[in-house]
Amino acid sequence: MSSQMLSPIAQRFEQLKHEKRLALMPFLMAGDPDLATTSEVLLSLQNSGADMVELGMPYSDPLADGPVIQAAAARALAAGTTPGKVLEMLTSLKGQLTIPVILFTYSNPLLNVGMEAFCERAAAAGAAGLVVPDLPLEEAERLSPLAEQQGLDLVLLVAPTTPADRMVRIGQRSRGFTYLVSVTGVTGERAQMETRVEGLVEELKQSSAVPVAVGFGISGADQVRQVRSWGADGAIVGSALVKRMAAAGEGQIAEEAGQFCRELRNAAD
């Protein structure tokens, strides 16, 4: 497949593979503490070595998220953040934000708008992919062609508890990359990641040509290096970044996010 045919996410992974580098993929919650800050942070992460960004759409009942990201979602909702406003903010960054943005949304907001309409709006705003953590594989099989029509990659998740045959199906149906959840349970920092993940990276890479990114529980440079040593293609860092941003002084959030991103970038190379 020529690079013209590849999605923005696939192109980025191809480039990194050629450079023998790990994709650094920070996660942040849109609208925490407000959307103006989110747009500053997105540009700061891009300038600090992020290869792509996962942007959370705040939702009132985030089942897959731990306390840090739940608190960020609550702050964003309290500030009046809505899916429509997130997409408006993203649209306003066109031309400035050139790294792929993957929207992380629960299925309820997506189904409220309608799968097709959501995909159209997300693509029009400049998103490159979607992650819907609570969407069953069977529903994902309905959403995937609608996303693909709009040039969006629907990224599917695999956990250490996923049965082997189902894991193969997910790996083969995921687009852009497969999101490997490194621990069972909700998102959050972990001092020790489950060593079983190393074997899962290998299994996924054997059964599918799609890159594998590890997320949930990566808290710093040491774990980014660990993920790299396992042969994964990307590392997703969420709670640790969100926590750093929440602790930063007013006006310092984008700078603090960029500083943390540079630390992780050094570990990823």
From Swiss-Prot:
Lyase listed as a keyword: yes
EC main group: lyase
UniProt entry keywords in alphabetical sequence: Amino-acid biosynthesis, Aromatic amino acid biosynthesis, Lyase, Tryptophan biosynthesis
Active site as annotated: 54, 65
EC number of this enzyme: 4.2.1.20
UniProt-listed PROSITE patterns: TRP_SYNTHASE_ALPHA
Reactions that this protein is recorded to catalyse: (1S,2R)-1-C-(indol-3-yl)glycerol 3-phosphate + L-serine = D-glyceraldehyde 3-phosphate + L-tryptophan + H2O
Cystine connections: none
Pathway in which the depicted protein is active: Amino-acid biosynthesis; L-tryptophan biosynthesis; L-tryptophan from chorismate: step 5/5
GO CC terms, sorted: cytosol
NCBIfam families, per the entry: trpA
Quaternary structure note: Tetramer of two alpha and two beta chains.
Family: Belongs to the TrpA family.
Record's protein name: Tryptophan synthase alpha chain
Lineage of producing organism: Bacteria, Bacillati, Cyanobacteriota, Cyanophyceae, Synechococcales
